Swiss-Prot record:
Residues 18-157 are extracellular. The record marks 164 as: Interaction with TYROBP. Coiled coil: none annotated. This is CMRF35-like molecule 7.
Length: 209
């Protein structure tokens, strides 16, 4: 069964449901704000921010209340703008060990929706906090729903099978068809010329005494 690329993307959790920046950068001791947008259907759902390279094992650091009220936890804050269908996560007093993979997520029945965001903290001077005094992000009690961590890989492979491979086959077929067409034209012209020559010879024999 053929699926268009748009329908194919919609068939995977998280695709087009929530979107965010692939990478954000902030200075050490400074702050960074990440804005993630979501579909209107998730307007009143709780939003969260978790840390970890793998979706299935990341730790939720902060979660909204399902309203537009700002929630704070240590150096983190989250605010949901339901009218604009977006929410913002602010990380303050950035540290070098805050550099990691994070996820913008939507809490829902069944499988949560999420998108990956890379956070990169760069140094701006020598007067920085020592790593011995750095504290980990607070972890919100409760577990997140477990989903496949290979979501993006599966999306790529499905696009490859349903879009790129058929397109390549169509292209090869078109080239072969054009090649056969160009080969037939000289053959038909040769037959036409041969028949014309034979007709001319027969006509000449009939006219001659």
């Amino acid at each position: 069964m053929w699926l268009s690329p748009a329908l194919l993307l919609l068939s995977f959790p998280g695709c087009l449901s929530i979107q965010g920046p692939a990478l954000v950068r902030g200075p050490e001791q400074g702050s960074v704000t990440v804005q993630c947008r979501y579909s209107s259907r998730w307007q009143t759902n709780k939003k969260w921010w978790c840390r970890g390279a793998s979706w299935s094992t990341c730790r939720v650091l902060i979660r909204s209340t399902g309203s537009e009220k700002e929630t704070k936890s240590g150096r983190l804050s989250i605010r949901d703008n339901q009218k604009n269908h977006s929410f913002q996560v602010t990380m303050e007093m950035l540290r070098q060990n805050d550099t990691d993979t994070y996820w913008c997520g939507i809490e829902k029945f069944g499988t949560d929706r999420g998108t990956r965001v890379k956070v990169n903290v760069y140094s701006v001077g020598k007067d920085t906090m020592s790593t011995s005094n750095q504290l980990p992000w607070p972890t919100v009690d409760g577990s997140t729903d477990m989903v496949s961590s290979d979501l993006q890989k599966r999306t790529y492979y499905m696009l490859l099978v349903f879009v790129k491979v058929p397109a390549l086959l169509i292209l090869v077929g078109a080239v072969l068809w054009l090649k056969r067409s160009t080969q037939k034209v000289p053959e038909e012209q040769w037959r036409h010329t041969l028949c014309s020559d034979l007709d001319s010879e027969l006509l000449a024999k009939d006219i001659s005494p």
